[in-house]
Amino acid sequence: MSVKIRLQRFGKHKKPFYRVVAINSKNSRDGKFLEILGTYEPLLGNINLNTKNIEKWLFYGAVPTLTVKNLINKQNKNNKS
């Protein structure tokens, strides 16, 4: 089973809200997920990620999407400053 870390879209029309989830790569975007790893609100710019659980999934071999990788880097940059 290959696992990806990707975004799941929630919210209303033109008011998106995303969950960062670990999910089987064969499942659909809004399919059954393995674990919720954080949230992202693009309109407010809020990024809340559980870095310990993300590191755990990366250690197990999960592959983050490009967008999730950028969010992780953005949060790490904000935490350092």
Swiss-Prot record:
Task: Give the record's keywords alphabetically.
Answer: Ribonucleoprotein, Ribosomal protein
Gene3D superfamilies according to UniProt: 3.30.1320.10
GO BP terms in the entry: translation
Q: Which Pfam families match?
A: Ribosomal_S16
Extract one GO cellular component term from the record: small ribosomal subunit
The family database entries (NCBIfam families) matched by this protein are listed as: S16 (TIGR00002)
Q: What is this protein called?
A: Small ribosomal subunit protein bS16
Q: Which GO terms describe its molecular function?
A: structural constituent of ribosome
Q: Which gene encodes it?
A: rpsP
* Family (UniProt): Belongs to the bacterial ribosomal protein bS16 family.
At the top level, the lineage of the source is Bacteria
Q: Which InterPro entries match?
A: Ribosomal_bS16, Ribosomal_bS16_dom_sf
Disulfide-bonded cysteines: none
